[in-house]
Amino acid sequence: MFNSIVMVKQVPDTANISGKVMKDDGTVNRTKLPAIFNHEDRVALELALQVKEKYGGKVTAVTMGPPRASDVLRECLYMGANETYLVSDRKFAGADTLATSYVLSEVIKKIGNYDFIFAGRQAIDGDTAQVGPQTAEKLGIPQITYTEEILNVEKN
């Protein structure tokens, strides 16, 4: 049995951005756009669920965001996750990747009891591809990036 934690993110659906959603400073007003499950994180969740199906264990999804990010966590439960955690505080608004990875690493430490941590390659809103690697660094664990398939897993 293997326990997995999956970091997921709710992102704005940027498929149809118009001038109506732009702020005066040129940034996107996220409240004016529908929110969606970040595609790369959905792929990470699907991979974790494949490990669960093949070897047993549990899948926990965690996200940092506003209260409406619970929609993504609900979707994780529908897909097969066993439990979810939403970390939300107005102070987190606009957090950079270092702050985000710090918060997520602290949450993961509190959850504990994991064999794997999955993260999508990058979020479509920031496009940095830094939160997964930075979280691994803060946890002091090795990372493997750009994984598309897990063929076999053994303890130790």
Regions found by a protein language model. Name each.
Residues 1-156:
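N-terminal glycine-rich FAD/FM-binding segment characteristic of electron-transfer flavoproteins
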